[in-house]
């Protein structure tokens, strides 16, 4: 084996990238240790591959690019068939989700299959009656501070846009963590207008006020986001910790998430929301379904 520490490998022609590069075969390698490969290790692999090179085609080793899946799950259970508390069931569900993430995902060829995940949740305990689990996906980019730059972020999965102008007033299907731009002390965020435009805004008394309604574009069919001439001065903390990245979160068109080329899909279990509640219908407190509420699937 040329690199025995490889846990997962993906290879494709450079001509298949968003910006085609001919004469190159790209090889994505995820190390078993979980860390990215050093430049020295990458060059060593390239050297070992030289005897296998075809004509003028050269190999290039690239690091995996992570797409995080965020879950919001509402689970209903029958209190009369278990002595377990909702907290205990929640803990067991999180364990099942974590095991799925570790054992099935985090490889180049591993698709997040939504029905498999929801089935695992249902099978955690016989008292569980149903779960409504919604999906968002997240990527990040690292801005060059105090420099006007163009950024391309590739989800490589279609994102939800059932009609032109979808959810325009509420920010479309794109959200971001905060940052400040050069020349302003206002914390800025990104959303979309449902018509392919990425907008930059700040909050004034909780209301979105747009600084730039054409900060970039979003391609709903393939999840490509382009940010034009964005001059980031500083980056806001994320979940209470200092950050060097800006996170972008979108609603996918499909609940199944596919890793493409150098992508690896993983569940962000820590930042997913799991709510376990007693089902009132089977518990006897609902009257022929009157007053029974369901959770939105969207």
At which residue positions do the language-model features occur?
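Carbohydrate-recognition loop of C-type lectin domains
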Residues: 1-108
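Hydrophobic alpha-helix feature that most strongly marks membrane-spanning transmembrane helices
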Residues: 4, 50, 54, 98-102, ...
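Short, glycine-/Ser/Thr-/acidic-enriched flexible segments
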Residues: 16, 31-34, 76-80, 142, ...
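Surface-exposed interaction regions enriched in Ser/Thr/Asp/Glu
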Residues: 30, 194-198, 206-298
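Short beta-strands and strand-coil junctions in structured, solvent-facing domains, enriched
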Residues: 34-36, 79-84, 104, 123, ...
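An aromatic-glycine-centered, glycine-rich loop/turn in mixed alpha/beta architecture
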Residues: 84-183
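Structural flexibility/helix-modulation signal
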Residues: 166-213
